[in-house]
Amino acid sequence: MIDPIHQFNVEKIFTIGHIGNQEIAFTNSSAYMLLAVAIISLLMIGGSAGRQMVPGRLQSLAELSYEFVANTIRSTAGVEGLKFFPLVFSLFMFIMVSNMVGIIPYTFTIASHIIVTAALAFLVFFTVLIYGFKKNGLGFFKIFVPSGVPGFILPLVVFIEVFSFFLRPISHSVRLFANMLAGHIALKVFASFIPLLAGLGIAGYFGAVLPLGMVVALTALELLVAFLQAYVFAILTCIYLNDALHAGH
């Protein structure tokens, strides 16, 4: 059986340079990150160039993406949250496009590496932290003190709130990483059964129908998961930003 983990290997394409003894390389992961950015750029530039009253497919897709993210921000962080639209939109589109590209056979799934998802999660975490203190000062600490909590359990609640706050980037990154990793491993495992069973002759052809059907179903599911994981990452970002925007509310 083909190794289902091999598809996640980061492979060097060429060396960029060195910092001390550390080699800086351009990898397949770097290439697919650039590809995702290029696809998003082409979509948004192509969709906004020569706009029509009756939009074409590209313009409709660009406008739909824009409005979807804008409405998500308004519903979770309020109108004031729209100042973070560039951040949330970039995260949503980058994760969704890279996830969908990764479903194509023989490509690379960027979000299958915890270092990538952790970088995105910590970007959100430090944005919330920095903006929260900039806007609210020491009042930002109010997010750790829920209103209406009886005084005798307040220290415990504050401890839990602080602990959960610093766990945010971990849960934020692991959720995306684990879902993409597990889904692609399942796809690879079922796909590897198809040629193995088909090689057994007529009986094998009939036996290969089941894994083939599973691959088709899992691929459809992965397309849905690719969107849902991007949406979950974006909406959690909005919820966290809401703490910075409206501390103590």
UniProtKB/Swiss-Prot annotation:
It is a multi-pass membrane protein. GO terms for molecular function: proton-transporting ATP synthase activity, rotational mechanism. It holds the Pfam family ATP-synt_A. Disulfide bonds: none annotated. SUPFAM superfamilies: F1F0 ATP synthase subunit A. The chain crosses the membrane at residues 30-50, 84-104, 113-133, 143-163, 196-216, 221-241. It is found in: Cell inner membrane. CDD domains: ATP-synt_Fo_a_6. Keywords: ATP synthesis, Cell inner membrane, Cell membrane, CF(0), Hydrogen ion transport, Ion transport, Membrane, Transmembrane, Transmembrane helix, Transport. GO terms for cellular component: plasma membrane; proton-transporting ATP synthase complex. It comes from the Bacteria. Belongs to the ATPase A chain family. F-type ATPases have 2 components, CF(1) - the catalytic core - and CF(0) - the membrane proton channel. CF(1) has five subunits: alpha(3), beta(3), gamma(1), delta(1), epsilon(1). CF(0) has four main subunits: a, b, b' and c. Key component of the proton channel; it plays a direct role in the translocation of protons across the membrane. This is ATP synthase subunit a. It comes from Rhodopseudomonas palustris (strain BisA53). The gene is atpB.
